[in-house]
Regions:
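Alpha-helical substrate-binding/gating segment
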Residues: 66-77
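Hydrophobic alpha-helix immediately C-terminal to the catalytic Tyr-X-X-X-Lys motif of short-chain
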Residues: 1-9, 22, 72
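Conserved active-site helix of classical SDR/Rossmann-fold NAD(P)-dependent CH-OH oxidoreductases
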Residues: 2-7, 17, 66-67
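Alpha-helical segment proximal to the catalytic Tyr-Lys
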Residues: 7-12, 78
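Short, small/polar-rich loop/turn modules that mediate ligand/substrate recognition or access, typified
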Residues: 13, 18, 80-82
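Short, flexible catalytic-loop segment of classical short-chain dehydrogenase/reductase
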Residues: 24-35
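Short C-terminal tail/terminal secondary-structure segment
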Residues: 70, 81-97
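A conserved structural motif in NAD(P)-dependent oxidoreductases
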Residues: 41-43, 54-65
């Protein structure tokens, strides 16, 4: 969707509008804390599986999305269009090697 929409908006508005996406990995926050951690702070089975599949071996902190977002909103990324930026500690690329 991001790529298609970027092309559509470029055809309509030229370089006045950019369409990009942030693709967050697993960030520990209130909405998923019980799914990923036990009451004592240890990982649930699912949380442990996520950690084992993430090269950084930790969950992200929601504040770690800020840098990518600020860059996408800045003049430093004016030629960036139709891309999805993964902020996931390597989760989507890790094959368990």
């Amino acid at each position: 969707y991001t790529k298609w929409f970027a092309v559509e908006m470029a055809n309509r508005y030229g370089d006045k509008l950019r369409m990009n996406a942030l693709v967050p990995g697993f960030f520990l926050a209130e909405q998923n804390r019980r799914l990923l951690t036990n009451e004592d702070g240890s990982y649930t089975d699912r949380g442990d599986k996520v950690i084992r599949s993430t090269p950084y071996k930790r969950f992200g902190n929601p504040d770690e999305l800020t840098g990518a977002l600020i860059w996408l909103l800045s003049d430093e990324s004016t030629f960036v269009n139709g891309t999805s930026i993964k902020v996931d500690g390597g989760f989507t690329i890790f094959s368990g090697v």
